[in-house]
Regions:
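Acidic/histidine-rich catalytic cores of soluble enzymes
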Residues: 154-243
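Conserved, mostly hydrophobic/aromatic
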Residues: 30, 50, 58, 84, ...
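Active-site acidic/histidine proton-transfer and metal-coordination neighborhood
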Residues: 6-7, 12-13, 64, 90, ...
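N-terminal export signals
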Residues: 1-21
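Acidic (Asp/Glu)-rich catalytic clusters
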Residues: 47-52, 72-90, 106-117, 147-155, ...
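Hydrophobic faces of well-ordered beta-strands that scaffold small-molecule active sites
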Residues: 26-31, 58-60, 91-94, 120-122, ...
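C-terminal segment of N-terminal export signals and the immediately downstream linker at the start
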Residues: 17-49
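Glycine-rich, proline-tolerant flexible connector loops at the mouths of alpha/beta enzymes
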Residues: 59-79
């Protein structure tokens, strides 16, 4: 099980977990990618720990598209759902690999439907480490297969989500690729999931929630402080302990139509449970 510290660890050990709390009228969610190593060895135990820490909803990564989640292939989708239900965790969303969505769309959609998911997300379109030679034509080329997948997903009652990492958060000739991609997406079949840490690249969540109100459904939440000793110049901290104005973010998110959010602190998974008390106390 992943390490928990402080109040979150105390709650688990004493049998007094943070119970259901929806400070924004939304479940407190957790992206499971930061705890992927723990999931690979003890899925049920990791889910127990997340629930004890106060999370009531998770977002998975596909067992067939993410190597660190491949141990979950031994479960049928309904079995995974049953384990989550046993621990009182909801799961309506997962991240998928591009090959799963573009080359194996029918199989992936069938898996999601059997699981009971209503959202299928992709972390990025195009390269995760984009080159300066990328062009506007590349943007259109990357969006085209996602629109095709989204049409199939929509017909099956599932929403296709575009997350903004990698090339999606890059710039071409000083212009944001993200806006170019949004312009190419079919708004009838796609929604957006905002990565709050892209504020570090100049993508302000409040600005985007206001600019594209109605297009967003979800977001990943990170907080950080400046730290010159790190390669990025930033260091992640629990939500509410860093530079992000969460009240402003959640107010804008609520107005934009965001229906779920997931804490995702990959640098140190132990920071995620420490974010729960702040989220429980936050009022917007």
């Amino acid at each position: 099980m992943f390490l928990m510290r402080g109040a979150a660890a105390s709650g688990l050990l004493t049998g007094a977990p943070y119970l259901s709390a929806n400070p924004l009228g939304l479940p407190i969610g957790c992206q499971t990618y930061p705890v992927r190593k723990s999931i690979s060895t003890d899925f049920a135990g990791t889910m127990k720990g997340l629930r004890a820490a106060g999370f009531t909803q998770i977002e998975l990564c596909s067992p067939y598209g993410y190597d660190d989640f491949s141990s979950l292939q031994k479960y049928k989708p309904q079995e995974l759902r049953r384990i989550l239900n046993d621990w009182g965790l909801g799961c309506i969303s997962a991240h998928w690999g591009s090959n799963e969505l573009f080359q194996k769309a029918d199989e992936s959609i069938a898996y999601a439907r059997e699981f009971g998911m209503t959202q299928m997300a992709i972390a990025a379109l195009g390269p995760f480490n984009p080159k300066t030679s990328q062009t506007v034509d590349d943007v259109k080329r990357y969006v085209e297969p996602f629109n095709a997948f989204a049409e199939k997903a929509h017909a099956a009652g599932i929403v296709a989500l575009l997350h903004n990492e990698g090339f999606v958060s890059a710039y071409i000739d000083g212009k944001p690729v993200y806006d170019m991609m949004i312009a190419e997406l079919n708004p009838a079949t796609t929604k957006l999931q905002f990565q709050v840490s892209t504020l570090q690249q100049g993508y302000d969540p409040v600005t985007y929630f206001q600019k594209y109100s109605g297009r967003y459904l979800s977001m990943h939440c990170q907080d950080w402080v400046k730290d010159s000793s790190t390669k990025s110049g930033f260091r992640q901290v629990p939500l509410g302990k860093g530079v992000v104005d969460w009240k402003a973010v959640f107010l804008a998110a609520k107005s934009a139509g965001v229906k779920n959010y997931f804490v995702e602190l990959e640098e140190d998974p132990a920071l995620m449970p420490l974010s729960v008390p702040y989220l429980k106390s936050l009022k917007v």
